[in-house]
Amino acid sequence: LVLLYCTVDDLLKNQIRGGEWRQSNNKPRCTDAEILVVAMMQSYFRTDTLKQTYLLVKANDATAFPDLPGYKQWLARLHRVGYQSGALMFYIPFRVEEVDGIYLVDSYPIRMCEPIRHGRVRLLREDGAYFGNGSKGWFFGFKLHVISTRNGQIIGAILTAGNVDDRDGARYLLDYLEEEGIAIADLGYRGTNFQAEIYETNGVLFITRADITDEELKKVHSLVRTRVETIFSELWRRFANRVYARSWLGLWNTLQLKMLDYKLCHARMLPAN
């Protein structure tokens, strides 16, 4: 808890306006770092909901955050500073060996319910949740599109409706890729028109298994892509696949906290959970 707080507090202070985003001179006694750290302890406690996490933090060490507000006020503060957790991800340094111009691109379904409830589900439908089809069949919800380094450090992510094509999701993330880079992708990104468009406009070469004829190179492609599966399994282990949010903002803030925790552990700024 102490290590996590010190890490997040230092990252916030290193931002240009870290912790100083309020327009008034009224600074709450409970800092933004404290608000974020309590939520990030969800990965440590392996709890399903933020409320369980909040109660466990208070029960295990009530003196750690003496000015922590009540749960509802804390949750409202968390949603207001949610953009801070997204900004923090860009301040986590990359290891030198990770910056080699080779990227992994993939998407991950964020399901709102089990398939048996598809006929009557309404959760977050007005916020964009919709039916999509992935490698494991149909689902109702959103897609988390992720770009990472070859070694598995997340560079950028975006949350879209479940029916958004993987290639359209990749277009939103192209600014994270360097020119003359190579993106290793699955068959959901194949298509000569798409690949030619991305190469001509951004100078990034998308390579799928369908583009490779040599059997040995196909094995290398599959081996490299296992890293992105590791990313999603680590996010799943942090309960990123369990949705209890009742708004798009709440869902996105929760996913950002999972990714922030993953990035800190991957960068060895925190011990692996």
Please give the residue ranges for each predicted region.
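Short alpha-helical elements
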Residues: 1-273
